[in-house]
Amino acid sequence: MAHRALSIAPPDVQALDIDFYAFSAHKLFGPTGLGALYGKAQRLAEMVPWQGGGKMLTAVNFEGFAPQAVPWCFEAGTPNVAGVIGLSAALQWLNGIDLVAAERWSSNLAAVAEARLAAALPGFVSYRASGSSLLAFNVAGVHHSDVVTLLAESGVSVRAGQHCAQPLLAALGVSGTLRASFAPYNTQDDVDALVAAMTTAITILAD
């Protein structure tokens, strides 16, 4: 999960001699539908655009096309301007906080939520890794999709499903999980809201 590391401990791509590094904006608390690819100049120069499009070409004819120089030859058409502005704002915000302290805060909230949910909900099963700010869990006897619907009605946003990790879930023997992802802007009030909404949801689904 290299792209997730950017909001925790950004890598030194030169010290690590990284050829390519891809990340998505929403993992940095930016807008969805946007990503970026870092590449060494040498590696990018070795690549050939697999298709042509507006703004990435210097010439086009019936035999083919001539691409712009690197990196302009790899992005065709009108860019996602609003998304880029949003990502820029997110990066400025991240650059202004202590990332180590922020991750410690987030993981502490996840640990508190895990303990409180375990105490409040019979059949609670956690899949959280030690020190992680991501809390994946299930409650025996209820389906994660039903739970997430009720949580949304209470104004609590979590994810439900396979989280792009089907092999892991298969190894765990579950069809999906709920996932509460804690971030630097979350507070104890959010933990309270999650526990209250989960308690209500399980009570409703148990009837």
Predicted regions and their residues:
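Pyridoxal 5′-phosphate
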Residues: 1-207
